[in-house]
Regions:
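Basic, helix-initiating cap at the start of DNA-binding domains
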Residues: 1-27, 31-43, 60, 71
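Alpha-helical DNA-contacting segments of helix-turn-helix folds
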Residues: 56-67
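Hydrophobic alpha-helical connector segments
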Residues: 69-107
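Amphipathic alpha-helical packing segments from all-alpha helical-bundle domains
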Residues: 114-139, 147-151
Length: 190
């Protein structure tokens, strides 16, 4: 894949996600069709399916798992597993290009309001947990400790993200996520 086609792919995915979120917020998730999303983005419905396998995926896919796993892998191996995961997640939050706060807020609100999307969110979180755990296990951490550390960190981030999205406060998303990791770091040091 060339740089041009990679850029075009990313641009098309972003157009589809923006169009979907706009339509979901205007007319509701259930009332919005893939055809409407594609038309709003200026592409065919087949192009939609080249980028997202389902309507759910346009909300749930974020592509951060590889970046998160790489950030945890880059964290110092001498740390306790939970601390290492927190260090890696902090690095990922700093270095990964996150979508705008309002886009994240809208995506999470839409996902929280629909049982199918909530289930998909849990499945995506499990995939992220597994990616983090695999990194830790590869460096000699027991599978049990690796799964507990990754699950604890992602549970903290999930709580922080949901509370941030559902609040009326204008604090930055990154501050809320960092505060959740602070709780875990303090717990790990005790």
């Amino acid at each position: 894949m060339t740089v041009t086609s990679t850029t075009r792919t990313a641009r098309t995915r972003a157009l589809l996600q923006v169009a979907a979120l706009r339509l979901f917020s205007e007319q509701g998730y259930d009332a919005t069709t893939v055809e409407q999303i594609a038309r709003e983005a200026g592409v065919s419905h087949m192009t939609f399916f080249r980028h997202f396998p389902t309507k759910d995926a346009v909300v749930l896919d974020d592509g951060f798992d590889p970046a998160i796993a790489a950030a945890v892998a880059a964290a110092p191996t001498g740390l306790l597993p939970l601390t290492r995961v927190c260090v890696g997640l902090r690095a990922a939050l700093t270095h990964v290009d996150l979508p705008g706060q309002e886009e994240v807020r809208l995506r999470v609100r839409i996902a929280a309001e629909h049982s199918v999307l909530r289930a998909g969110t849990y499945a995506a979180t499990e995939a992220t947990q597994e990616a983090i755990a695999e990194v830790l296990v590869a460096d000699g951490v027991s599978p049990f400790e690796a799964r507990v550390a990754s699950a604890a960190a992602l549970a903290a981030l999930t709580v922080a993200l949901l509370e941030w999205c559902l609040s009326d406060e204008n604090d930055p998303m990154s501050a809320r996520l960092s505060a959740a990791l602070d709780v875990l770091d303090e717990t790990a040091r005790r």
